[in-house]
């Protein structure tokens, strides 16, 4: 019986994990917070020993050390691979001038998106601490991307660097806008700040999508992922598809390719 692969996506906000079976299906999933945010360790006690761990880590050395300690405590000696972006892998060609500068999370997400939507031109918008946009052609060529502050970071920056504006979280902002989303302009400061930053996200995406469709002269599927996707989606006027497992799905493909080469 083939052992599953343990997949770990360590982002700046939290850490997601999954077990993938031989068919690259995610059969068990979970998430946990960073130590700095009071996040408890994951409960892996009921999981079988995997073939190995494949890790995308954009959260730094301290998180890498924590993951090593967690893996060693549960499965001593477990092989592990921290992925890096490459010039080409799993049907995706990296268009960055220096391919290894592309974040490993974005690289895995591109691979996952290519597999999820084969033969389609894609604009992939991922909403985390940063909002990232990736342009992926139907033949698997990643032609470039955009990086902007995420919704939460935009609001936090305004609250931190101005004297009279509040510092709002996405939970607070989402609640404020729940009954006011239909109105293009707001009548108090917290809602104005929440909506302004949200529309900045939506405006970036819609401009990028239209520019891409014009440049490629072809239909482009807009794919949304990440924690603020629901809120941003409500501000969009474009059709879109939601997919929240692109990075883990891409890691599953990378793991399967690596295991086949062992």
From Swiss-Prot:
One of its GO terms (molecular function) is pantothenate kinase activity. InterPro entries: ATPase_NBD, Type_III_PanK. It is found in: Cytoplasm. Substrate binds at residues 96, 103-106, 189. The keyword Nucleotidyltransferase does not apply. It comes from the Bacteria. Pathway: Cofactor biosynthesis; coenzyme A biosynthesis; CoA from (R)-pantothenate: step 1/5. ATP binds at residues 9-16, 129. Signal peptide: none annotated. Its EC number is 2.7.1.33. Its cofactor is NH4(+); K(+). Catalyzes the phosphorylation of pantothenate (Pan), the first step in CoA biosynthesis. NCBIfam families: baf, PRK13328.1-4. PANTHER family: TYPE III PANTOTHENATE KINASE. This is Type III pantothenate kinase. The lineage of its organism: Bacteria, Pseudomonadati, Pseudomonadota, Betaproteobacteria, Burkholderiales.
